[in-house]
């Protein structure tokens, strides 16, 4: 069987045209190079060089073999390069699942910053409901997820992130627009555009209003916070939404105000539990946490 050391000797001989120069190139003795070439010729049963005194002339067979050996070494060099890039986290792919609110704009900024100095890193961002995020990440279909989380979920490691305060949205010209903070009692009798009854934020909003004895007119509900913002901008009522969606919609005609009492907006980074995350995933998680901590939203 051909040995790798024999090929490592054959290649520099072909490149330099002599045993001595090849020995100098790879920093071994000339007799050692000569012995490896003889062993290679004996192994394959073919003469690779015509010897005339101190001169070597490659045979036709040597030329054919050299092409294959070059492919082999080029492949190894490429593997070395890939391994080095992976070590630096400059190569690879990320699959991220995220529920709607952070995916609207925030995640785009995180990805843009993360891959700016990683030209060989690819990212796939899938925007799905929170429950689907949990399912997909637990099945290891995705490397990392961002989800609203209520309690533990099997197959997942969760990393809590800063909890933000939900905000109150008002249409332009609303009677409360001059207030820096809207209190629940200010909304007595108001038309309140609500999220779906199964939404955690909706439940928390209802609890905050009920604790203050506030009664609102809940004529319109929407399963999507972005639709709620649009309805507010059309003067259909006021709304309580997460700060991600409110920020994304801020260029439109809506007024954003702090809301009291606090309606917490909790979510988490989730990862599969079966194995430690690859370095690239760990670095993306760290970048994500840094970006969340830098947000100007009110925290709890």
UniProtKB/Swiss-Prot annotation:
Positive regulatory protein for the noc operon involved in nopaline catabolism and uptake. The gene is nocR. GO terms for molecular function: DNA-binding transcription factor activity; sequence-specific DNA binding. One of its GO terms (biological process) is positive regulation of gene expression. This is Regulatory protein NocR. It holds the Pfam family LysR_substrate. InterPro entries: LysR_subst-bd (IPR005119), NocR_PBP2 (IPR037424), Tscrpt_reg_HTH_LysR (IPR000847), WH-like_DNA-bd_sf (IPR036388), WH_DNA-bd_sf (IPR036390). The keyword Cell cycle does not apply. Belongs to the LysR transcriptional regulatory family. Residues 19-38 bind DNA. Keywords: Activator, DNA-binding, Plasmid, Transcription, Transcription regulation. Residues 1-59 form the HTH lysR-type domain. It comes from Agrobacterium tumefaciens (strain T37).
